[in-house]
């Protein structure tokens, strides 16, 4: 069955300035800054939380539909995803706005000047999940990823109304949402995904206790960076899964999206919680070792070897068997 992934679709435009921003800023003129930097290069990466997760699920062989909003400039990105098995028929194309874009220039001190253009993402609120269900049938799971906040609320309510299982994954939007808004996204979720900082932020903003949250969801999935991930059930049963050791640390961007995609692909394929988290941890480390969130490569034999090294031959055999 299909996993429907809702959330942001974006492109990242990254540049490098071979000097120091600090040397160009004159204290006496900070009230009227007007600067232009000649950069060395420009690298464009495909991204957005929904784009990243849909890409990874497709690469792993899962059935996935991308549900989000993009601009007319989405054509190349669409072809890229379709080549990986992603159903892009439910991407709303804006008639007026470009695809969301993150632009960032980094200097030699790793200082950054960045901007984010939400663009077409603001139109995601116009997407109806009922239309997706009519076209592809009832999805196995709907991921409610970081997106236009109003779209997140509407998608969540529609999942409840239509009886669709959903995963709450507010991630970076937790910082801007109020406690009341966060509460609207949680109740009834099959999965609640956060990292450890976001979990504490969620509790702080909502005023809920852990018990309050666990009474409303089926499973809490909290990633812990280099310490792995905790899977917590309502009765307190906890499974901890460690990371797959990395060969290098290139860029952490998109690691959380990768884990979620691997974990949910495993669940969809019939794996248990622990094995699914182990698969998610492998996909996460592949992204960590790559430049760009969708530039990693999937190699069946290499995956089996790394899983065996991290979790043992038996675990590796169980995981790769469902991906064959």
From Swiss-Prot:
Catalyzed reaction equations: adenosine + ATP = AMP + ADP + H(+); adenosine + GTP = GDP + AMP + H(+); dGTP + adenosine = dGDP + AMP + H(+)
Entry protein name: Adenosine kinase
Keyword check for ATP-binding: yes
Modified residues (N-acetylthreonine): 2
Key words of the record: Acetylation, ATP-binding, Kinase, Magnesium, Nucleotide-binding, Purine salvage, Transferase
Other noteworthy facts: Was identified as a high-confidence drug target.
GO biological process: AMP salvage; purine ribonucleoside salvage
A GO term from the CC aspect: plasma membrane
Pathway where this protein functions: Purine metabolism; AMP biosynthesis via salvage pathway; AMP from adenosine: step 1/1
Description of activity control: The enzyme is subject to substrate inhibition by adenosine and is competitively inhibited by the adenosine analog iodotubercidin. Unlike other adenosine kinases it is not stimulated by inorganic phosphate. Activity is stimulated in the presence of potassium. Is inhibited by a series of 7-(het)aryl-7-deazaadenine ribonucleosides bearing small and bulky substituents in position 7; some of them display micromolar antimycobacterial activity and low cytotoxicity.
Residue positions of the active site: 257 (proton acceptor)
Annotated residues for binding of substrate: 8, 12, 36, 48, 52, 102, 116, 172-173, 257
Subunit structure: Homodimer.
Record Pfam families: PfkB
Keyword hit for Nucleotide-binding: yes
GO molecular function: adenosine kinase activity; ATP binding; dGTP binding; GTP binding; magnesium ion binding
Binding site for ATP: 195, 223-228, 256
Annotated EC: 2.7.1.20
Listed cofactors: Mg(2+)
Organism listed in the record: Mycobacterium tuberculosis (strain ATCC 25618 / H37Rv)
Chain's role: Catalyzes the phosphorylation of adenosine to adenosine monophosphate (AMP). Can also catalyze the phosphorylation of the adenosine analog 2-methyladenosine (methyl-Ado) to methyl-AMP, the first step in the metabolism of this compound to an active form that displays antitubercular activity. Is not active on guanosine, inosine, deoxyadenosine, cytidine, uridine, or thymidine. Prefers dGTP and GTP to ATP as phosphate donors in vitro.
